[in-house]
């Protein structure tokens, strides 16, 4: 610690800065990497707090937060007549982004509280380039570039602890960063496709309409089904089956609901069209008044301040204000249109992969007691973690949850034995994993070389965004961990390793570790960025450190697989027993490397198992869901 207790908190490395008159603390993997490359002594912010302490009561927090969402819903109903009359819970409908926002503020507040109490700084110099970014208070843009949480929170904490705060910014980064309005360009491109009828052609190919020579009166004949999240196999497969069973198929894409004909695709509902200006204006005024009164809601805001250990709700208020004044207004108008659409078109089922998308919120909220349709969610993410957030994303808003395998079915049946989730029935359709298994067996194995090929797939990483009920590895800790694993891989010259990353510089792994591997030019490490399933027939073994969907895909393909998981994260006990040696806990890189070493030296058969899949027909599944009430 420096004599005058001056600290440089480095979020973005600035080469012109003189770091010599204080202790340097790296806040991000990128900063840590740059400081190390420039041989500047530093520590990381993780040295000042305990992750285990922060996450120890997460299950209690989960249900406590659900109560907070309910209070928020009551507040909105008290001030917005449409929500009260139609019993619409708009806050809970947008659970995902609101939770990410609040949990991120709570996490960063915990980190800074640990730093201020343990470092006892007298002055802080925040080195960052996020000052040049225009703050956007949209809940659905918190994953994109914005002023960092450190930039937002540090003034509050410095005032609370009586610490002086200065900013150090690269002047070159302060230039006006103007980029094309991607949303506008995308909308214009979509209109262009609609005019050319190219979307009808894409639909004709995607859903294999060319195989449907005449309308069938199958088991789903005349049933109206609205599909969200099309364009991926698990949903497109169901769309095709619905076609061949005679259903009336509708698909949604952003501001449009399309009716899928035998050869063409036509617009059934355009959410952009204004129906009643007076209705829109009434909703806008009520939402504006609600947003104003939110500032006086001591109970809602006090809960946030208590969890953040400081007066942080003032920073979150602009996001909630934006949510009420913009998202709620837009949603209510769309909900009214969607509700009328369900009635006119006699929609029987809505099929999605989750409730966390922007479109899902109003589409699902539009279903009320006036409609006799079923809301169905097909599992989008498999996991062995005790991941409570999945219950909200995949179960809470639905009548049926369709799992991909028998193990997941058993897990969700146990976890939904709770008054909050008991209304949702758990069933299974293994069509995705069964198709993956069949496809994998048909593919010829990659020609084996003299050395075994092992693919290592790190978990997806989100820069600076937290969900306290989803296991997320801390970026700074995880970056150092991955560097140690890469060091081990390069020493194992008897093997060839594929380091799988995301394309297009998705996160800090691509910005920090991919250049690191390329710079070192390791002879036995290759970088690949295609989906994991495209490598299943090309590799001898698979190593993961986050047992979710990729783990299940590898297991069903019968590829010898080892998945590590951080030991302080809870996993389902039955999954631990079922997968046996294929799941191994670790606390640090040394322990993880030990597990990998034993895996590479062991008989492959010890790391292969048969994932139970119950075969079922999609049409039968829908019929059972309809008649069961």
Describe every region a protein language model picked out:
Residues 1-629:
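Catalytic-core helical/loop segments in enzymes performing group transfer/polymerization on anionic/lipid-linked
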């Amino acid at each position: 610690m420096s004599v005058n207790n001056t600290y440089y908190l480095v979020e973005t490395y600035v080469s012109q800065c003189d770091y010599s008159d204080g202790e340097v603390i790296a806040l991000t993997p990128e900063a840590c990497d740059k400081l190390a490359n420039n041989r500047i002594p530093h520590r990381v912010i993780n040295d000042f707090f305990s992750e285990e302490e922060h996450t120890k009561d997460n299950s209690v927090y989960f249900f406590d937060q659900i109560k907070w969402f309910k209070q928020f819903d009551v507040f909105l109903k008290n001030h917005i007549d449409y929500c009260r009359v139609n019993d619409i819970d708009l806050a809970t409908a947008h659970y995902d982004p609101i939770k990410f926002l609040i949990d991120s503020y709570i996490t960063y507040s915990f980190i800074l509280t640990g730093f201020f109490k343990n470092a006892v700084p007298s002055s802080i110099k925040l080195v960052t380039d996020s000052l040049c970014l225009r703050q956007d208070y949209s809940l659905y843009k918190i994953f994109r570039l914005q002023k960092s949480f450190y930039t937002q929170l540090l003034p509050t904490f410095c005032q609370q602890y009586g610490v002086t705060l200065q900013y150090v910014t690269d002047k070159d980064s302060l230039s006006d960063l103007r980029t094309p309005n991607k949303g506008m360009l995308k909308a214009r491109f979509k209109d262009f496709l609609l005019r050319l009828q190219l979307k009808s052609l894409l639909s004709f190919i995607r859903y294999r309409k060319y195989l449907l020579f005449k309308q069938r009166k199958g088991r789903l004949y005349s049933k109206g089904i609205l599909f969200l999240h099309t364009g991926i196999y698990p949903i497109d497969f169901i769309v095709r089956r619905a076609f061949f069973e005679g259903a009336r198929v509708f698909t949604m894409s952003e501001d449009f609901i399309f009716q899928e004909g035998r050869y063409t695709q036509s617009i059934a509902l355009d959410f952009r069209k204004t129906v009643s200006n007076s209705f829109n204006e009434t909703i806008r005024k009520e939402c504006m008044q609600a947003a104003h009164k939110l500032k006086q809601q001591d109970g809602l805001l006090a809960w946030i301040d208590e969890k953040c250990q400081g007066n942080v709700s003032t920073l979150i208020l602009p996001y909630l204000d934006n949510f009420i004044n913009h998202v709620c207004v837009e949603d209510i108008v769309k909900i009214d249109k969607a509700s009328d659409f369900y009635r006119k078109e006699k929609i029987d089922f809505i099929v999605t992969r989750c409730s966390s998308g922007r479109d899902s919120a109003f589409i699902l909220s539009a279903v009320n007691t006036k409609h006799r349709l079923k809301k169905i969610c097909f599992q989008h993410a498999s996991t062995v973690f005790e991941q409570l957030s999945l219950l909200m994303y995949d179960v809470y808003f639905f009548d049926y949850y369709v799992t991909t395998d028998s193990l997941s079915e058993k897990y969700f049946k146990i976890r939904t034995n709770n008054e909050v989730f008991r209304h949702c029935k758990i069933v299974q359709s293994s069509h995705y994993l069964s198709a993956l298994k069949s496809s994998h067996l048909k593919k010829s194995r990659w020609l084996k070389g003299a050395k075994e090929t092992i693919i290592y797939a790190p978990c997806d990483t989100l820069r600076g965004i937290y969900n306290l009920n989803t296991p997320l590895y801390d970026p700074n800790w995880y970056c150092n961990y991955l560097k140690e694993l890469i060091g081990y891989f390069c020493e194992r010259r008897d093997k060839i390793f594929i380091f799988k990353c995301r394309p297009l510089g998705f996160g800090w792994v691509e910005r920090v570790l991919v250049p690191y591997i390329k710079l070192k030019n390791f002879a036995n490490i290759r970088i690949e960025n295609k989906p994991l399933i495209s490598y299943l027939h090309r590799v001898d073994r698979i190593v993961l450190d986050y047992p979710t969907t990729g783990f299940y895909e590898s297991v069903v393909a019968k590829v010898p697989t080892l998945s590590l998981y951080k030991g302080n994260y809870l996993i389902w006990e039955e999954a631990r027993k079922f997968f046996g040696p294929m799941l191994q806990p670790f606390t640090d890189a040394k322990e993880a490397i030990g597990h990998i070493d034993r895996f590479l030296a062991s008989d492959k058969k010890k790391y292969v198992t048969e994932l139970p899949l119950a075969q079922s027909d999609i049409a039968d599944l829908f019929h059972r869901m309809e008649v069961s009430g």
